[in-house]
């Protein structure tokens, strides 16, 4: 009971009267303020009116002498920094000197596409790039033009070769050693007929076969194409993608172009075998044999005219039936609608005989009879999974060597 009485001054005032200072405290506070007013005015802090430049020196003077001694040290350190030779050695050259040669070099871009003509000494000496120019080798000269990348150089070469397919293209392809960095052109030098032709994209995608050099004297080549004899391939270089297909009657039709391999084939009239049918090797990889085009409609198997060892591009087994499965034993296909490459049944003419000349290929002449349709062993569809050429396993009239 004694504790609440002792702590009354510490408790909450429950009466609710206003809290004021006691009169004794107010009298002592007034006396202390009146007595201390005079010395407070005398002991006011000093005010310094200084400028920005003198602020550091005044602060150092007020704080003490050690900071004043450290003041001349930073200028000494700054004076030693420009004398550092390592920083001067690794300092890069100014960017203005690198961007300056980019103005005259785009006009010299066509000669720059060849490594032999890449060096341009008249344009390089005016710029004092002594540290970079001696290190630039034969192929590093391409990087002198910082605004051009190898891809842009290659695209400019393609545009120049496509646009100027006349004397300019022949001038740029006298020898294939001038284009070592172009993909796909490493395979072209051993094809004799391609030196005079302009480079086209998609031309490097065709497989080159040993019989490719016989294009210039093929009988169907001189009849079908309207180009002169020394240039047997301008017809093919007009289109960068699929090539014109050889009709069964011989002449090329420009409106008949092959679809990409493996896509929907287009119907081709199969009335008579092409004169190229009796040739030892095919003319182009994308112009298959006439009998094979009945089924595939232009599926690009390179060596089907000569029964070469090359397999079908999509077959994992032996070669499918070169004549196409629709031509089983009768001239008319029993499954015209189920065959991928035949949109309508087409009878073969009587002169489409399996002669000895037509059977000559890379594996030698066959022994098939020339009178009537033969009865050869069945096609691989009977013993293996179905070949991509058809849906039904049917014997092939041309497989008499197997």
Curated annotation (Swiss-Prot):
Q: Where is the composition biased (Low complexity)?
A: 218-240, 381-390
This protein's record includes keyword ATP-binding: no
> Where is the sequence biased in composition, kind Pro residues?
103-113, 257-266, 371-380
Q: Where is this motif: VQ?
A: 55-64
Residue spans with biased composition (Polar residues)?
24-44, 76-87, 160-173, 349-358
- Gene name tied to this protein: IKU1
- Here the disulfide bonds are none
The record's note on quaternary structure and interaction partners says: Interacts with WRKY10. Interacts with MPK6.
What's a GO cellular component annotated to this UniProt protein? Answer: polar nucleus
What are the entry keywords?
A: Nucleus, Stress response
Q: Which InterPro entries match?
A: VQ, VQ_5/9/14
GO terms for biological process, alphabetical: endosperm development; regulation of seed growth
Q: Where is the signal peptide?
A: none
Q: Where is this region: Disordered?
A: 1-44, 63-135, 160-266, 346-402
Stated name of the protein:
Protein HAIKU1
One Pfam family named in its UniProt record: VQ
Please give the function described in this protein's UniProt entry.
Modulates seed size by negatively regulating the cellularization of syncytial endosperm. May function by binding and modulating the activity of WRKY10 transcription factor.
How does a null allele present? Answer: Reduced seed size and early endosperm cellularization.
Protein's cellular compartments? Nucleus
């Amino acid at each position: 009971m004694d504790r609440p009485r002792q702590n009354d001054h510490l408790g909450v005032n429950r009466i609710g009267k206003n809290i004021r200072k006691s009169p004794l405290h107010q009298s002592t506070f007034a006396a202390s303020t009146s007595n201390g007013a005079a010395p407070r005015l005398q002991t006011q802090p000093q005010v310094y009116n200084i400028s920005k430049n003198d602020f550091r020196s005044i602060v150092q003077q007020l704080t003490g002498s050690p900071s004043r001694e450290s003041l001349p040290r930073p200028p000494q350190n700054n004076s030693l920094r420009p004398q550092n030779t390592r920083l001067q050695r690794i300092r890069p050259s100014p960017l203005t000197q690198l961007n300056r040669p980019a103005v005259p070099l785009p006009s010299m871009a066509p000669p720059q596409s060849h490594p032999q003509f890449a060096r341009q000494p008249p344009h390089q000496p005016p710029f004092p790039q002594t540290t970079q120019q001696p290190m630039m080798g034969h192929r590093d000269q391409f990087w002198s033009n910082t605004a051009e990348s190898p891809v842009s150089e290659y695209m400019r070469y393609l545009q120049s070769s496509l646009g100027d397919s006349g004397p300019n293209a022949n001038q740029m392809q006298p020898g294939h050693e001038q284009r070592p960095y172009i993909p796909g052109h490493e395979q072209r030098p051993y094809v004799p007929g391609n030196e005079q032709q302009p480079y086209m994209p998609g031309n490097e995608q065709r497989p080159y076969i040993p019989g490719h050099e016989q294009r210039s004297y093929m009988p169907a080549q001189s009849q079908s194409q309207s180009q002169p004899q020394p240039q047997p391939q301008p017809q093919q270089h007009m289109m960068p993608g699929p090539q014109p297909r050889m009709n069964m009657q011989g002449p090329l039709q420009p409106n008949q172009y092959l679809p990409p391999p493996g896509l929907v084939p287009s119907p081709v009239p199969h009335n008579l075998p092409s004169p190229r049918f009796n040739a030892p090797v095919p003319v182009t990889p994308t112009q298959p044999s006439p009998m094979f085009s009945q089924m595939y409609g232009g599926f690009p198997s390179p060596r089907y005219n000569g029964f070469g060892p090359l397999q079908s591009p999509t077959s994992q087994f032996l070669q499918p039936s070169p004549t196409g499965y629709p031509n089983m034993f009768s001239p008319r296909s029993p499954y015209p609608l189920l065959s991928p490459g035949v949109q309508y049944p087409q009878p073969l003419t009587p002169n489409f005989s399996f002669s000895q000349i037509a059977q000559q290929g890379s594996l030698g002449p066959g022994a098939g009879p020339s009178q009537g349709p033969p009865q050869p062993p069945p096609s691989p569809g009977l013993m293996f999974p179905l070949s991509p050429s058809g849906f039904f396993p049917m014997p092939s009239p041309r497989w008499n060597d197997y």
